[in-house]
UniProtKB/Swiss-Prot annotation:
GO BP, one annotated term: thiamine biosynthetic process
Purpose: Catalyzes the phosphorylation of the hydroxyl group of 4-methyl-5-beta-hydroxyethylthiazole (THZ).
Pfam families: HK
Organism listed in the record: Corynebacterium efficiens (strain DSM 44549 / YS-314 / AJ 12310 / JCM 11189 / NBRC 100395)
Protein family (similarity comment): Belongs to the Thz kinase family.
Keywords: ATP-binding, Kinase, Magnesium, Metal-binding, Nucleotide-binding, Thiamine biosynthesis, Transferase
Sites where the protein binds ATP: R119, T165
Requisite cofactors: Mg(2+)
GO molecular function: ATP binding; hydroxyethylthiazole kinase activity; magnesium ion binding
Known pathway: Cofactor biosynthesis; thiamine diphosphate biosynthesis; 4-methyl-5-(2-phosphoethyl)-thiazole from 5-(2-hydroxyethyl)-4-methylthiazole: step 1/1
Name of the protein described by the UniProt record: Hydroxyethylthiazole kinase
EC number, as in UniProt: 2.7.1.50
Keyword Aminoacyl-tRNA synthetase: no
InterPro entries, per the entry: Hyethyz_kinase, Ribokinase-like
């Protein structure tokens, strides 16, 4: 159903999905606020002793390797094991893959554990698939269009959904390719918007897991929600500081009509 993604925000707000975030220290507060704004419940449970059990009761799990330590690597591995055992959808955000050997090895092992979704920029997705070297730090040096093959490779390997963010977002799963035009350039000037999107994606997958909304459409909805909110925020703010606040407000206030009017979605046959 072409517009099924429009129904997903209502489910998120109605169910308040619990999202376990194993994410980087730079973005933790912003990520938690973004989840609260969309109607989800954040939990930053990342220690090895607790992450397995918590992944079993969470509705969704985010694995983000932005600022990893030895303890967090262990916690992420345990959370993946717990999510897999419980059938909890988990999202892999491969921050900085390609440039650092230990991080890249961990992230590539994680791919083989079948995340429900992978979300990254074009250079991260290309590097994760083994088709490129990665970007410049956490910034992409590849265009989204250059990552189509890599996204399809990863979707086949995991059986899940792969999202590539950029000026136009790409969402790929086995048999489907969607292009989503939304967002605003100001999003790139606020640290943590991409990382928060990974958490929002986990919330959407958790809220829609036992519904007739396909995981592909849930991932589209997550990206549409943040992108539309980004556009609204740009009309209310003139600089990055005020934009960050306006973005949280817009995430909370977004309604179905705004989502439909501020999102341009097209499906492509490949």
């Amino acid at each position: 159903m072409a517009d099924s993604y429009l129904h997903a925000p209502t489910l998120v707000r109605a169910t308040t999905p619990l999202v376990q975030c194993l994410t980087n220290a730079v973005v933790m507060q912003f990520t938690a606020n973004a989840l609260l704004a969309i109607g989800a419940s954040p939990a930053m449970v990342d220690t090895p002793a607790e992450s397995f059990d918590f992944a079993g009761v969470a509705d969704g799990v985010l694995i983000n390797a932005g600022t990893p330590s030895a303890e967090q690597y262990a916690g992420m591995e345990r959370a993946i094991e717990g999510a897999t055992a419980a059938g909890t959808p988990w999202v892999l955000d491969p921050v900085g893959v390609g440039g650092l050997a230990e991080r890249s090895a961990f992230l590539r092992r994680a791919v083989d554990k079948h995340p429900a979704a992978i979300r990254g920029n074009a250079s991260e997705i290309v590097a994760l698939a083994g088709l490129g070297a990665g970007g410049r730090g956490v910034d992409a040096t590849d265009d989204v269009a250059d990552a189509v093959e890599a996204a399809q490779v990863l979707a086949r390997r995991t059986g899940g959904v792969v999202a590539v963010t950029g000026a136009e977002d790409l969402i790929v799963s086995r048999g489907r390719v969607s292009w989503l035009k939304s967002g605003d350039p100001m999003l790139q000037l606020v640290i943590g918007t991409g990382c928060a999107l990974g958490a929002v994606t986990a919330a959407y997958l958790g809220a829609t897991q036992d519904t007739d909304i396909d995981p592909h459409d849930a991932v589209v909805a997550a990206h549409a929600h943040l992108g539309a909110a980004g556009r609204i925020a740009a009309t209310r703010a003139t600089a990055p500081g005020s934009y960050a606040v306006a973005l949280i407000d817009a995430l909370h206030q977004l309604d179905r009509n705004q989502l439909a009017n501020l999102t341009h979605l097209r499906e492509e046959n490949r």
